[in-house]
Design a protein with these regions (language model features):
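Short, acidic/turn-prone active-site loops that include or flank metal/cofactor-
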Residues: 2-5, 116-117
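Active-site anion/phosphate-binding pocket segments in diverse small-molecule metabolic enzymes
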Residues: 112-114, 152-163
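Residue-level marker of alpha-helix boundaries and capping positions
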Residues: 4-5, 66, 144, 185
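Conserved metal-phosphate-binding beta-hairpin within the catalytic cores
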Residues: 90, 100, 157-189
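Active-site nucleotide/adenylate-binding loops and adjacent lid/helix of ATP-dependent enzymes
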Residues: 6-95, 150
Length: 197
């Protein structure tokens, strides 16, 4: 379980493993501190808008939404203050959901889906912890969207060897859920999503 937690905490590695399992994800670019930064290469790979993310940070720390090339370098510099590894992803536009999965009595159960509607530009720290978002449980989704998201969340849980409770976050693009990240240590406060599910 420790190595699984480390894998899911490392956004880049987790998404690489998920992609190999056939789970759709955003286009992404890896960048390490000290490497030559090619703004053109980043733009060509992920386009704009995009997200610059500290690779190993939680609660949306070190995450910046970038709309054009002139904003990219400052966002990279800020994100490097959080981690020396970055993940730069194309910004997916669509409905955002989170799916809880848990193992109970030797059976894997998928919890009701929660849709996240952020008042901010994305589900950032303020939206998560300062009430700047609305969570709708159960999410009002077309049946086929719900089925595909639940299937993917369960597949990730089983094939990655997750234990306890996990929360997989997706954004729908053209009716297809794209994985954003997996949280294997989800919050359990009254404001947290898993207790609502």
């Amino acid at each position: 379980p420790t190595d699984v937690a480390a894998l899911t905490y490392n956004k880049r590695d987790c998404l690489t493993v998920a992609s190999a399992m056939g789970i759709p994800t955003a286009k992404r670019y890896r960048l390490n501190q000290g490497e030559t930064i090619s703004l053109d290469a980043i733009e060509n790979k992920v386009g704009f808008p995009c997200f610059v993310k500290a690779n190993r940070a939680g609660s949306s720390f070190g995450v910046y939404k970038v709309y054009d090339k002139k904003e990219l370098q400052p966002a990279i510099e800020k994100a490097f203050e959080e981690d020396h590894q970055l993940l730069i992803e194309s910004a997916l536009e669509g409905r955002e959901i989170t799916v809880g999965v848990l193992e109970w009595k030797n059976d894997v159960h998928v919890l009701p889906i929660t849709e996240i509607i952020s008042e901010n530009d994305f589900f950032d720290y303020q939206a998560k912890y300062e009430g700047k978002s609305t969570e709708i449980t159960p999410a009002q989704l077309p049946a086929e969207w719900e089925a595909s998201a639940k299937k993917m969340a369960k597949q990730l849980y089983i094939q990655m060897g997750l234990k306890g409770i996990s929360r997989s976050e997706f954004i729908f693009q053209d009716g297809v859920p794209h994985l954003l990240e997996i949280n294997t240590i989800p919050g359990m406060t009254l404001q947290s999503i898993i207790p609502q599910q």
